[in-house]
């Protein structure tokens, strides 16, 4: 009998055949694609030897161009040349226009408030534009590797929310790519440096790209990459340096008109060129719109100093979350082209007390790490023992009675992760339960962020507390959340995948974390009060049902005592005295003990009625 050949689902039937995989750094300003060849990770250049691909797409009626050719058209055809589209991913049109009021594009809102860009090629959304960039990178990889890609790992900022991550996945699928995984950019850098240098200990990854800033505190130990804490700002990067310098040049040149898109582009191009030159020189000559002048590195440093300080404040918060001090950090990895700015390297070095690592090209390190991870995930390194653990930035939980938040997965828990908790019904005969998914660090619903709501129906009508509902939170490797609620006796269940239409800003995330610390004592007191009020309501509801059913078991005097105790509890439960509510609950319990005993005796007699002692 011949053997039946089998293989793992999704893997090649020829187990020793090398599969083609790539890592893609889908950046705000520039993008790269990398792969592993002969055991070495390397970025793939275009025909002219250029490794970076400008994240720019120029649209025309007859087609589109991506990269350098598109960027060269920016000044002549600004409205049809889309750049920094990553900043628009997962955001509403209102949010984009509030954040970036000077974007030179013709926007229209879709039916759900998401942005559509009106171009010569028609209405396009950020997902489509990102897909065109990904197609160009995939084509470069396929040509270089002489074959179609079996899978890719695409990097995203650590603080990208669910909508932004899902948008990135959608763009990849639109580009015809099989996504092996989305990988946080700082984590990709840790993979690149961890495998190359073999360092063990705490590492800070300072990632300042064109449009985003991320700081990650990682522990590297024996091949395990664990993210201890993350922080950052998804709306801060080298683009902001460029715009500040462009505005400064505008002022020096006396250019008041902001409506001329061609001049806007010339100013921005001049600012970018000056920024790059000032990384090596102390002064640079600028010639734009008929104006000539000189800009010094000191002037540039003054312009960007506040932004650099903002990144260091995020570093301090991340270190606090990780429970480490700056001196505990073994290495500081610099990622992103903007880390070439001398002031950035200087301030980061001063903050951590050590010279930052720049051994791997900061523009390429993320793509290289992604390529290494893709090579493993596609099955080319079955003997690899590398383990990668990312974290969620904010706690996830549920609303419970009294407006309280029950945390199911705490902040900075490594992902992928699944956690479950059991809940029960509050009222007799309750047949449905509303599941309200929350995100945040505070104790009360009003102080946290609502992620989603759904209902579980078909719960059997049992006494309060009789039904058992298991709620499971599952966060996958891409940071996407699924919540499932199941009634255990019947198996009836409902679920939801959380995909916010647009996300939470990193400033709000930092504020939520800060508030949880500032209001910790106040929140604990508020929670204790809410819990006592919920317990008071439960006791009173239960007592009302018991009195309705078995009031005949009480004398008039006993009934009066119970009614008085219940009235007192109802009154104090309206106030804010936790101790008074607790004492009133105890008093009701004391006054109803004999009543409860009689009800129990009566239930036993009813159960035994018509049965002999032998049957019992």
From Swiss-Prot:
Molecular-function annotations in GO: ATP binding; ATP hydrolysis activity; ATP-dependent protein folding chaperone; unfolded protein binding
Q: Which Gene3D superfamilies match?
A: 1.20.1270.10, 3.30.420.40, Actin, Chain A, domain 4, Substrate Binding Domain Of DNAk, Chain A, domain 1
Q: Which CDD domains does the record associate with it?
A: ASKHA_NBD_HSP70_HscA
Name any Gene Ontology BP term.
Answer: iron-sulfur cluster assembly
Q: Does the record bear Protein biosynthesis in its keywords?
A: no
UniProt xrefs under Pfam families? HSP70
The entry's family comment says: Belongs to the heat shock protein 70 family.
Can you name this protein? Chaperone protein HscA
> In the record, what lineage is assigned to the organism producing the protein?
Bacteria, Pseudomonadati, Pseudomonadota, Gammaproteobacteria, Enterobacterales
């Amino acid at each position: 009998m011949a053997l039946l050949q089998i293989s793992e689902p999704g893997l090649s039937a020829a187990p020793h055949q090398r599969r083609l995989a790539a890592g893609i750094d889908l950046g705000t300003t520039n993008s790269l694609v990398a792969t592993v060849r002969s055991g070495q990770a390397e970025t793939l250049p275009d025909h002219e030897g250029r490794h970076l691909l400008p994240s720019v797409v120029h649209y025309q009626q007859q087609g589109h161009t991506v990269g350098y050719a598109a960027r060269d058209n920016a000044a002549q055809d600004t409205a049809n040349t889309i750049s920094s589209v990553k900043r628009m991913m997962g955001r509403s049109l209102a949010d984009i226009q509030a954040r970036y009021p000077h974007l030179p594009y013709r926007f229209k809102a879709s039916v759900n408030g998401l942005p559509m860009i009106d171009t010569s090629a028609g209405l396009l959304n950020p997902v489509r534009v990102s897909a065109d960039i990904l197609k160009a990178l995939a084509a470069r990889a396929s040509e270089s590797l002489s074959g179609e890609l079996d899978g890719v790992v695409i990097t995203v900022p650590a603080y990208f929310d669910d909508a932004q991550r899902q948008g990135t996945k959608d763009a990849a699928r639109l580009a015809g790519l099989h996504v092996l995984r989305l990988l946080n950019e700082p984590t990709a850098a840790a993979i690149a440096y961890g495998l190359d240098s073999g360092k063990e200990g705490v590492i800070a990854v300072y990632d300042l790209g064109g449009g985003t800033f991320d700081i990650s505190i990682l522990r590297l130990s024996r091949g395990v990459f664990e993210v201890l804490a993350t922080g950052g700002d998804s709306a801060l990067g080298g683009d902001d340096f460029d715009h500040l310098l462009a505005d400064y040049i505008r002022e020096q040149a006396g250019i008041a008109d902001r409506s001329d898109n061609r001049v806007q582009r010339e100013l921005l191009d001049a600012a970018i060129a000056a920024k790059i030159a000032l990384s090596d020189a102390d002064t640079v000559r600028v010639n734009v719109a008929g104006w000539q002048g000189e800009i010094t590195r000191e002037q540039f440093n003054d312009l960007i100093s506040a932004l650099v300080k903002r990144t260091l404040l995020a570093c301090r918060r991340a270190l606090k979350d990780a429970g480490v001090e700056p001196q505990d950090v073994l290495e500081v990895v610099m990622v992103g082209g903007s880390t070439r700015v001398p002031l950035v390297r200087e301030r980061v070095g001063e903050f951590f007390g050590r010279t930052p690592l720049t051994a791997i090209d900061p523009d390429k390190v993320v793509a290289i790490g992604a390529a290494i991870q893709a090579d493993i995930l596609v099955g080319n390194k079955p003997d690899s023992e590398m383990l990668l653990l990312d974290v969620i930035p904010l706690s996830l939980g549920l609303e419970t009675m009294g407006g309280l938040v029950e945390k199911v997965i705490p902040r900075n828990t490594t992902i992928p992760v699944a956690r479950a908790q059991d809940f029960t019904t509050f009222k007799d005969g309750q047949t449905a339960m509303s599941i309200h998914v929350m995100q945040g660090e505070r104790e009360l619903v009003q102080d946290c962020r609502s992620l989603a709501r759904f209902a579980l129906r078909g719960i059997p009508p049992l006494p309060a507390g009789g039904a058992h509902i298991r709620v499971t939170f599952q966060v996958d490797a891409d940071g996407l959340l699924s919540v499932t609620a199941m009634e255990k006796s019947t198996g009836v269940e409902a679920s939801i995948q959380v995909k916010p239409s647009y996300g939470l800003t990193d400033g709000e995330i930092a504020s939520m974390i800060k508030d949880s610390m500032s209001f910790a004592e106040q929140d604990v007191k508020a929670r204790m009060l809410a819990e006592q009020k919920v317990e008071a309501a439960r006791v009173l509801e239960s007592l009302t049902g018991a009195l309705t059913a078995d009031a005949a078991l009480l004398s008039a005097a006993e009934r009066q005592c119970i009614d008085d105790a219940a009235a007192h509890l109802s009154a104090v439960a309206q106030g804010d005295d936790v101790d008074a509510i607790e004492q009133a609950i105890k008093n009701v319990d004391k006054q109803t003990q004999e009543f409860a005993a009689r009800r129990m005796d009566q239930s036993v007699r009813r159960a035994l009625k018509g049965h002999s002692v032998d049957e019992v």
